[in-house]
């Protein structure tokens, strides 16, 4: 004998959240022999929305008992419920194709509305929206299904929204590889630390103006990095080598840097830095932060004095990408599972080589080639692009007694 055809029933519960709502609903449903297809729940400011999709024979869905029992049980606990029947029994769809992150301080309704309009105009369906952060920025994640061939248009449209609405909007493929990153490498100057180390050294020689002009031109991609490095280092000739330790002691981490590295270590990432700066200045910080890999330039020192030259291979644009590949090989990590974070034109090749390249408060030349761009001066925003939420960060910190929020001045 053929079993009677089945239909689907969507039950939506809304109201003030309280313990036991889900248990109450499923206790009733179990008495009617329904089969569970899907459950989704969200709670915002203690307001619950619970959706339960079930299938059952048509006579159960159409009869009065199921509706009566569900409504009576839910209203008894003070919540509202709606019940919708459909002849279709839906098949669970393929997962979303992309994820979109929107980060801002603040995210205005106008900004999010602009994102939603561009998404809709391209026929992109929003499958899920969730909050990922309330500090140091507001962060939202949208999982979406993008029609074939619309990927490029989506990225272009959302880049425009990002610029016009002053929010960060990043689009990533929603694939298994997104969850499998294992090695992350940071640039140092203006990324891991605030400011430029070469300018701090130049200040000791009274050449900060000259060096700053050369640095700016190099970071905009207007000068060959190797030549600009040699010109800048030449201004340091004659300085005592003790200035290296002085400058190393003056380095200030980018806000959120410790949180970022602490969290990444908990997740099992290998972490490194690749810098066009100088190894002797960076190494003490790298040791303090327990970094696994360091690549940087070497200042020549003769008789305790800087000669104004570098020795060994120069870590330039190509050298940074080479260092990333070497780190990945040493760590046994495929390049698809690497992340690179930087801010200047000399980071272009490194970000292009990485599985995920993130431009951090970057020059236009780098933003154009990066997979994602961040414009807020908090390094821990990188974690959100890796799928880590602020709640997860602080829950892990709480175990070690490290939860701390610093007041952020208005932008």
Swiss-Prot record:
Keywords: Amino-acid biosynthesis, Hydrolase, Magnesium, Metal-binding, Serine biosynthesis. Its EC number is 3.1.3.3. GO terms for biological process: L-serine biosynthetic process. Substrate binds at residues 196, 232, 275-276, 320, 346. It holds the Pfam family ACT_6. The keyword Cell membrane does not apply. CDD domains: ACT_PSP_1, ACT_PSP_2, HAD_PSP. It catalyses: O-phospho-L-serine + H2O = L-serine + phosphate; O-phospho-D-serine + H2O = D-serine + phosphate. Pathway: Amino-acid biosynthesis; L-serine biosynthesis; L-serine from 3-phospho-D-glycerate: step 3/3. Its cofactor is Mg(2+). Mg(2+) binds at residues 187, 189, 343. Binds 1 Mg(2+) ion per subunit. The active site is at residues 187, 189. Residues 10-88 form the ACT domain. GO terms for cellular component: cytoplasm. It is an enzyme of class 3 (hydrolase). GO terms for molecular function: L-phosphoserine phosphatase activity; magnesium ion binding. The keyword Kinase does not apply. Homodimer. Belongs to the HAD-like hydrolase superfamily. SerB family. This is Phosphoserine phosphatase. It comes from Mycobacterium avium (strain 104). The gene is serB.
């Amino acid at each position: 004998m053929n079993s009677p055809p089945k239909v689907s029933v969507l039950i939506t519960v809304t109201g003030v959240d309280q313990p036991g709502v889900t248990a109450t609903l499923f206790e009733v449903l179990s008495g009617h022999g329904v089969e569970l297809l899907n459950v989704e729940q969200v709670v915002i400011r203690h307001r619950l929305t619970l959706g339960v999709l079930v299938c059952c024979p048509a006579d159960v869905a159409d009869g009065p008992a199921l509706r009566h029992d569900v409504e009576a049980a839910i209203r008894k606990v003070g919540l509202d419920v709606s019940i919708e029947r459909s002849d279709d029994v839906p098949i669970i769809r393929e997962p979303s194709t992309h994820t979109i992150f929107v980060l801002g301080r603040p995210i205005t309704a106008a900004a999010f509305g602009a994102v939603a309009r561009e998404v809709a105009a391209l026929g992109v369906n929003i499958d899920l929206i969730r909050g990922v952060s309330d500090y140091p920025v507001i962060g939202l994640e949208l999982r979406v299904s993008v029609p074939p061939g619309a990927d490029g248009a989506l990225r272009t449209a959302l880049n425009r929204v990002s610029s016009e609405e002053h929010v960060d909007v990043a689009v990533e493929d929603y694939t298994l590889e997104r969850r499998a990153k294992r090695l992350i490498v940071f640039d140092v100057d203006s990324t891991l630390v605030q400011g430029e180390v070469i300018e701090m050294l130049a200040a000791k020689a009274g050449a900060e103006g000259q060096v700053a002009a050369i640095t700016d031109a190099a970071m905009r991609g207007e000068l060959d990095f190797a030549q600009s490095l040699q010109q800048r280092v030449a201004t340091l000739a004659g300085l005592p080598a003790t200035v290296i330790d002085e400058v190393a002691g003056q380095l200030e981490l980018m806000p959120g840097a410790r949180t970022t590295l602490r969290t990444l270590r908990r997740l099992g990432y290998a972490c490194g830095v690749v810098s066009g700066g100088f190894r002797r200045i960076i190494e003490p910080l790298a040791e303090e932060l327990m970094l696994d890999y360091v690549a940087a330039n070497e200042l020549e020192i003769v008789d305790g004095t800087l000669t104004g030259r570098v020795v060994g291979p120069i870590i330039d644009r190509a050298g940074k990408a080479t260092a990333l590949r070497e780190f990945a090989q040493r760590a046994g990590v495929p390049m698809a599972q690497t992340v690179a974070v930087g801010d200047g034109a000399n980071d272009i090749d490194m970000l292009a080589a990485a599985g995920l390249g993130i431009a951090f408060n970057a020059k236009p030349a780098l933003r154009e080639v990066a997979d994602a761009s961040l414009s807020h001066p908090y390094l821990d925003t990188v974690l959100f692009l890796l799928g880590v939420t602020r709640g997860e960060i602080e829950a892990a910190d709480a175990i070690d007694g490290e939860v701390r929020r610093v007041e952020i001045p208005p932008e």
